[in-house]
Amino acid sequence: MMRKQTNTLLSALAFAFASATVSVPTMFIASNAIAQEAEQQDGQEIKASDKQTRRVPTLRGKVYEQLARAQTAADEAGDVEEAISILKEVEDKSHSMNAYEKAMMYNFFGFIYYNNEDYAKALESFAKVVEQQPIPEKFEMTTLFSLAQLNLMQGNYDDTITYLERWESLNAGPVPVKNKVIKAQAYYQNKQYEQASTWISEAVADHEAEGMIPDEGWLILQRAIFYELKQPEKVKDVLIKMVKLFDEPKYWIQLAGMYGELGEERKQLAIMETA
């Protein structure tokens, strides 16, 4: 009976990650980009390091006014169709626009489509943003990260990884923990468990090194990855950590199941009594 229970618990582990939510990306807000432009009409880059590597053209006043008009239609009047219509009028004149102006225009398209839950068109629009060059490096990196998140949400895991790697190619410092987690999620969903293991383990270790508690969802993901890799000792170790951090009955029961799988019946029985 105990062995059957153990097998059932182990089988459940394979599907445990399905209950973990994938964060919906917080897109950079078009109004923020417009606010930045109000302060940068002289064409300077967003940060000093960009000045050494990129010469970004100016967002001209007439283009700014049309983008602001589209934003007003979408945000204040709630008229998405009118906002899209205004942007399409701008797009019809894109042959006379510079790279930065086109990027800002597609950013607005993406923002409006995203808020209207038209994710396919939002993806298409944001992808066009990073096709335009030159644009401010910070703007490009923000868009690349949003593309990675939105592609993950849409199940485009290869694209998620590609956009993260493009982001990393522009990043001068270490890879942030949030990037590692998203990469691990994408590799896991792509059934590339070894790569997923590397990234989630680094993310958890980095977070703990800063004295912070890993997100519960990260540990659920790490546990699921180790399960797929048939590494029961590591699954057990993650569950021990989850029991200590979150003290949930389901984790106690799953830990008991893992002790049973590893032949440690005494610990299994002790855990079952505790649970």
Regions found by a protein language model. Give the residues of each.
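Structural motif corresponding to the intra-repeat A-B loop/turn of tetratricopeptide repeats
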Residues: 77, 116, 154, 190, ...
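N-terminal leader/linker segments that initiate helical-solenoid repeat arrays
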Residues: 15-17, 22-124, 139-142
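TPR-repeat structural position
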Residues: 79-80, 119, 157, 193, ...
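Long, internal scaffold/assembly segments composed of regular secondary structure
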Residues: 218-275
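Residue at a conserved register position within TPR or TPR-like alpha-solenoid repeats
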Residues: 73, 113, 151, 187, ...
